[in-house]
Amino acid sequence: MGNCVKSPLRNLSRKMRQEEKTSYMAVQTSEDGLADGGELHGPLMMLAQNCAVMHNLLGPACIFLRKGFAENRQPDRSLRPEEIEELREAFREFDKDKDGYINCRDLGNCMRTMGYMPTEMELIELSQQINMNLGGHVDFDDFVELMGPKLLAETADMIGVKELRDAFREFDTNGDGEISTSELREAMRKLLGHQVGHRDIEEIIRDVDLNGDGRVDFEEFVRMMSR
């Protein structure tokens, strides 16, 4: 897991480090996923268990890793139906005009949505491959050809789009497709068992709010989770 914390969040991270052990033990020992400050269940419980150091989540610097599957993965096998569906769901998320294609610019974000964290060099190589061979656009079959081997090799260490989407819905309590400051504050209260200050929440949102609207959409959430 990455442990680098962006500077606007350093002070908050320091405070959270002091309480991470207590917060994590509360999550681990609660049978129904309740923390002191409120209800914690489902995707939020999964996030908490996969990121014991809570300041990494707020960093935002946590790459969430699935545990326990590496021994069962066989890179030379075919994709399973559920893995094809995961690819399809990720592809749909970034096929914004619903024409059956995504462009090379969106491919990096799409890969991050799947939990695969490409290096800058990998993205350059993929971009060159797409522009030269695929006309700058990728249909679903091309996407499977590009991402299938990566999914087979990396899925043991990744959190997928379904888990990210489920976690996003837990934060987005009113279902409007964006996380507001109040929604993020409430999610952090549930995760940590105490209230996070308004200024700290605003700093978190400013750090990941790419379009400057003061809210976090799903694409920004994916970036937040993958830094």
UniProtKB/Swiss-Prot annotation:
The modification Phosphoserine is found at residue 180. Ca(2+) 2 binds at residues 172, 174, 176, 178, 183. The keyword Repeat applies. Coiled coil: none annotated. Gene3D superfamilies: EF-hand. The keyword Lipoprotein applies. Residues 82-117, 136-153, 159-194, 196-227 form the EF-hand domain. One of its GO terms (cellular component) is Golgi membrane. InterPro entries: CaBP1/2/4/5, EF-hand-dom_pair, EF_Hand_1_Ca_BS, EF_hand_dom. Disruption phenotype: Mice exhibit a normal retinal morphology but altered light responses of retinal ganglion cells. Signal peptide: none annotated. Ca(2+) 1 binds at residues 95, 97, 99, 101, 106. Keywords: Calcium, Lipoprotein, Metal-binding, Myristate, Palmitate, Phosphoprotein, Repeat, Sensory transduction, Vision. Expressed in the inner retina, specifically in amacrine cells and in cone OFF-bipolar cells (at protein level). A lipid is attached at residue 4 (S-palmitoyl cysteine). Homodimer; when bound to calcium or magnesium. Interacts (via C-terminus) with ITPR1, ITPR2 and ITPR3. This binding is calcium dependent and the interaction correlates with calcium concentration. An additional calcium-independent interaction with the N-terminus of ITPR1 results in a decreased InsP(3) binding to the receptor. Interacts with CACNA1A (via C-terminal CDB motif) in the pre- and postsynaptic membranes. Interacts with CACNA1D and CACNA1C (via C-terminal C and IQ motifs). EF-1 binds magnesium constitutively under physiological conditions, EF-3 and EF-4 bind calcium cooperatively and EF-2 binds neither calcium nor magnesium. This is Calcium-binding protein 1.
